């Protein structure tokens, strides 16, 4: 792995979210050349969710937003969001294996998806509608969940597609 920090590599340019939030930013540009060079030498870039504005001020960025912005910029086929939840759950708290934009909006309207899961799902929908074929939310607390997602037909967690 290779650690990517904003000060060292400056791969994420941000704009401030708002004055009320202080040093919280939204990505406006991802410099993919640095990431592509790291990937070419078979290393995995581990990116801190920090970016710099036009004045080189450091801003914090939501990690899911950074991951989505990088996936879109790299034109990734799939994005995995590793979380502390199984994925999207139905009313009976059972895992929903796959949802699309329409189903996600229905689940939000029905308040099945609520709270902090709403911005996570909205980010996933944005990523899926901007060139990434699918975003999966998987439970990082489960042993081998990433391998299960990558190497099985069934997958792990909830797959979100356009």
What is the predicted role of each segment?
Residues 1-141, 154:
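Nucleotide/pyrophosphate-binding catalytic subdomain
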Residues 97-99, 148-162:
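Conserved, well-ordered active-site substructure
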Residues 141-148:
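Low-complexity, intrinsically disordered Gly/Pro/Thr-rich segments
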């Amino acid at each position: 792995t290779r650690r990517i920090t904003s000060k060292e590599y400056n791969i994420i340019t941000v704009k401030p979210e708002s004055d009320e939030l202080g040093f919280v930013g939204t990505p406006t540009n991802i410099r993919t050349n640095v990431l592509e060079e790291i990937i070419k030498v078979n290393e995995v870039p581990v990116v801190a969710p920090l970016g710099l504005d036009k004045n080189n001020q450091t801003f914090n960025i939501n990690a899911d937003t950074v991951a989505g912005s990088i996936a879109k910029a790299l034109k990734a086929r799939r994005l995995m969001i590793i979380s502390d939840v199984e994925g999207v759950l139905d009313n009976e708290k059972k895992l929903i294996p796959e949802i699309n934009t329409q189903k996600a909006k229905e689940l939000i309207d029905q308040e099945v998806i609520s709270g902090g899961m709403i911005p996570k799902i909205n980010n996933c929908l944005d990523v899926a509608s901007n060139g990434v074929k699918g975003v999966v939310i998987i439970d990082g607390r489960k042993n081998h969940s990433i391998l299960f997602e990558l190497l099985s037909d069934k997958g792990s967690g909830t797959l979100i597609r356009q």
